């Protein structure tokens, strides 16, 4: 019998975080009632709110709560109020990065879906955007050039700097398996992004991904160089299902995927570790300029909650129900001003419309 009682650490954070989190919790209440499972949610301070209350962006009490939870639902952190602090003490670097490191969150999932009702919001040409697309960017988050040896030396004309791209077989294999497992829940197609024509690390990447693919005969695998991937995302994004990327390539391409949808307020993300424990958050920021005005788009937070249900709590049917309700609400023209400028819907209106469709 599958588990029906879960513990979730809710970290709403700053700016629009509390507003969009409240909307997501309304949706979680509706879907948990429908499917008969219980979500025990504990709310804890994070980011600027935690600095104000506890003197640091990531208090130990919050870390402990996360350790005792099945998943973390994260809102947004940061704002002008805390920009005077040293960089490592500011909300973003002082909370999100340490959480990722503490829990070994090496797998970043960034879905990018263009709903038919929003095809005109996409910056892509109409004949391309009208086809729609549904892409999942799987990015390795803790290895590669961002974490390799780096430094500077010399002076004047002889001054130089270097960064080192390094990947181990183990790091590549575990992210590849996540991509193939994710593809099984989708359209069973993985495209591995590399630069194997010039980079030694990409040669190993391609070799390991090929080996892992043998354990997933039902999943189609193809390869693409990163420069071509950047072009094809603009030319024909509908050809992709799961994009498997290293840290650097995934950092760039996941933002491109996000931008061609037309609204960051629609895009969720997940960061997972080896055991499936994850941190789920909207792809956008804390947007302090619109905080408290009731116009923040809650859909990215709501879809992040759906990802949590799917990947950490094993409630895929509940996740699909949320995603379907979101699509239906948007198709009916329900949305905040960032996607429907003249519709007049508030954050709470959007949440209510989605709940009504569950």
From Swiss-Prot:
Transmembrane segments: none annotated. Catalyzes the oxidation of 3-carboxy-2-hydroxy-4-methylpentanoate (3-isopropylmalate) to 3-carboxy-4-methyl-2-oxopentanoate. The product decarboxylates to 4-methyl-2 oxopentanoate. Homodimer. NAD(+) binds at residues 79-92, 285-297. It is an enzyme of class 1 (oxidoreductase). It comes from Pseudoalteromonas translucida (strain TAC 125). Substrate binds at residues 100, 110, 139, 227. One of its GO terms (molecular function) is NAD binding. This is 3-isopropylmalate dehydrogenase. The gene is leuB. GO terms for cellular component: cytosol.
